[in-house]
Amino acid sequence: MLDLHSDGVSRRIEKPKLRVLSLGAGVQSTTIALMAARGEIEAPDCAIFADTGDEPAAVYEHLAWLQSGVLPFPIHIAKPTRALSVALMAGDEDGARIPFHVGKGGMGGRNCTRNWKIRPIRQKIRELLGVGPHGYVAPGSVESWIGISLDEITRIKPSGCAFIHNRHILIEARMSRQDCYAWLAARQYRRPPKSRCIFCPFQGNIGWRNLKEEPAEWQEVIEIDGWLREPAQVKRFHGDVFLHHSRVPLAQADIAAADNGPDLFGNECEGVCGV
């Protein structure tokens, strides 16, 4: 078994009703899942994948592989009634805000992670516990494994839910994202794709370049980006907004340039996107 170091940042709780891996199907959460499958750490009771409906096809293909008997525990899918992109373009302003790059500078507010990731996962947890949406669950009943790695330790924060205790296996294992890649390569596992919505403004040029290699997905994102600056949307968003950090239309953005800006996924502190 791998030697884990519980401390003030992350710790194991004794005898929870449910141990669940928050599975983003990216490199970090995949590494945790496969470490459990190989017996290097204890196995969770299950994993939950929150499906926004807008992940890259490569993520869904990787998820299907994980579901093919690779893991000794089930993967449950938590999915809202409609995809995030559908809600966004339908004008669901309260439920579907993503962090656009604002033409005048800065980024807009967002609630996409909470409404398309956090809430569906919590609803699924309640379902697995046999508790309704308003039923009581004792504090500390659930140990939720989050795929934040050592190099992203600033993303850590409490669950914000009394009955869910966030645990960070990779922090306890002292593993960075690069350590995860090395662990996977040493055991001849495929390199997982980056988990995120295809139109996520947090991604840098590497993400956009990877997306452009999938023509259908690239065309979909180009159309969403252009739609953002149609007159009705300019009025809705009180100005021009963009998906690319350069604040120009994505079709014109220099995605060949090196990524030298901040890692915007560091703004996503729940640990359910990009992992």
Q: What positions do the PLM features span?
A:
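Nucleotide-activated chemistry modules centered on ATP-dependent adenylation/adenylyltransferase
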Residues: M1-V275
